[in-house]
């Protein structure tokens, strides 16, 4: 889709903050270093795919050198013309590689049935379809949060996001309805992410040090699994890659 970035390669650093730390940091960041992007505070909805026994996230939380996630993502209030992103996110030796396509809710339903979408990168569509066909995954966890995103005034490639009110559910597994859910963490921390295409500027390191903000390995989906899902019995149902009588991919919802 024109105007939508479909490939990313960057380093992402994560930090767990209190609300007081986040407010103080925001004041400093917006005092000449960064600006809030055009969307302001907005809701992000994610639908994570996994196996029935959560094999992908169980492997991921072991912190291997290579890990991968497949998810759907939507920004803001869901409407019929809302863009839905299908994303394959890989991390290797600390570098994040993300490949994605975008479409309307109806487009995404067709894509998940195995159709190819007009106007989207055909190579990326093949990569995503191949991954879905080779792995027995289906929608498992809906995860939402409120985000404020900032970009660097000198280096627009520098991105900082602050996410709050992290919540999840394992019912109504789509990105097209409400964003209700149960808090992942009872203390409701703020998750700061610094996304870098280049080296981190010195002023940012100094600000983080000033506010006693230190890097963490926090994973939203991983924390959700450990706090709420790890002791559940596997829910065995047909996989997203299984085919119906017409030979089309049947998306389990």
Stretches with model-predicted labels:
Residues 1-253:
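Phosphate-end processing signature that detects enzymes handling 5′-triphosphorylated RNA
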């Amino acid at each position: 889709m024109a105007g939508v970035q479909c490939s990313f390669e960057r380093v992402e650093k994560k930090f767990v903050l209190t609300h007081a730390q986040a407010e103080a940091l925001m004041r400093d960041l917006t005092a000449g270093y960064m600006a809030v992007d055009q969307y302001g505070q907005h809701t992000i909805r994610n639908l994570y795919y996994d196996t029935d026994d959560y094999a992908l996230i169980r492997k991921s939380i072991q912190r291997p050198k290579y890990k991968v996630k497949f998810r759907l993502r939507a920004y803001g209030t869901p409407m019929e013309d809302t863009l839905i992103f299908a994303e394959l996110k890989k991390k290797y030796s600390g570098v994040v590689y993300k490949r994605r396509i975008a479409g309307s809710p109806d487009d995404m339903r067709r894509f998940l049935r195995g159709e190819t979408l007009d106007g989207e990168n055909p190579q990326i569509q093949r990569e995503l379809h191949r991954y879905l066909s080779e792995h027995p995954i289906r929608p498992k966890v809906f995860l939402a949060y409120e985000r404020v995103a900032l970009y660097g005034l000198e280096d627009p490639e520098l991105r900082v996001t602050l996410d709050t009110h992290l919540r999840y559910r394992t019912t109504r597994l789509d990105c097209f309805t409400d964003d209700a859910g149960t808090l992942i963490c009872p203390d409701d921390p703020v998750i700061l992410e610094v996304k870098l295409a280049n080296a981190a500027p010195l002023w940012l390191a100094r600000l983080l040090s000033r506010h006693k903000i230190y890097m963490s390995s926090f994973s939203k989906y991983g924390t959700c699994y450990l706090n709420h899902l790890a002791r559940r019995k596997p829910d065995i149902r047909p996989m997203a890659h299984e085919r119906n009588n017409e030979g089309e991919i049947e998306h389990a919802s």
